[in-house]
């Protein structure tokens, strides 16, 4: 007998306590001369109703170019899961406006290596996780989005001196070969300081 279940209706618990068990009702009728008859209904198995997994997925690690971030699903649980083991699938997504997100090709593992170039700098990154419980029920979770920070990249190339290096001549610092991937508009700003040395080792600024 189910404790206190003695009325004509019964509210099946919304947790998993009776899922997959069998339920029946015993009814005893009493007539006007106190004759009693006991009847049992046909038993029926209590079916599961899909419960959404709870809690959230969190992105851990520095969200910056060149870094590797991880989808932390340790807090996600599902009462439908009999063995306590959820299966997760992952899809990393990016957005330019933090509103419309697109899947990143082949980014389907629990970790994601943010490119070390500028392709995702200032864009927004999130991960979509789908959990599947032992009964086949699925829940989709989205992490909070994070803006990808820039990491300072050194300018590449060399400065060269052009012109004849002789007394009375004018020489020029040629910086045309210097580039920097951090520079969005392609225009670098340069400052200059000419220096001289007597031994080609110790140099001093020229006033």
Language-model features, listed with the residues they occupy:
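Ser/Thr/Pro/Gly-rich low-complexity disordered regions
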Residues: 1-207
């Amino acid at each position: 007998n189910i404790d206190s279940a003695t009325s004509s209706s019964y509210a099946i618990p919304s947790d998993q306590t009776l899922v997959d068990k069998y339920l029946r009702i015993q009814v005893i009728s009493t007539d006007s001369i106190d004759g009693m008859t006991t009847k049992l209904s046909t038993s029926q198995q209590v079916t599961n109703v899909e419960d959404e997994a709870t809690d959230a997925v969190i992105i851990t690690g520095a969200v910056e170019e060149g870094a590797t971030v991880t989808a932390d699903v340790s807090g996600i649980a599902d009462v439908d899961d009999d063995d306590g083991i959820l299966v997760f699938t992952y899809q990393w997504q990016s957005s330019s406006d933090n509103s419309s997100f697109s899947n990143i090709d082949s980014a389907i593992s629990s970790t994601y290596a943010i490119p070390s170039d500028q392709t995702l700098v200032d864009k927004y990154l999130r991960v979509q996780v789908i959990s599947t419980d032992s009964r086949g029920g699925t829940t989709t979770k989205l992490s909070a989005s994070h803006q990808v920070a820039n990491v300072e990249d050194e300018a590449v190339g060399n400065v060269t001196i052009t012109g004849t290096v002789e007394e009375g001549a004018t020489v020029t610092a040629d910086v045309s070969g210097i580039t920097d991937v951090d520079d969005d508009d392609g225009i670098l700003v340069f400052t200059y300081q000419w220096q001289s040395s007597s031994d080609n080792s110790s140099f001093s600024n020229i006033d």
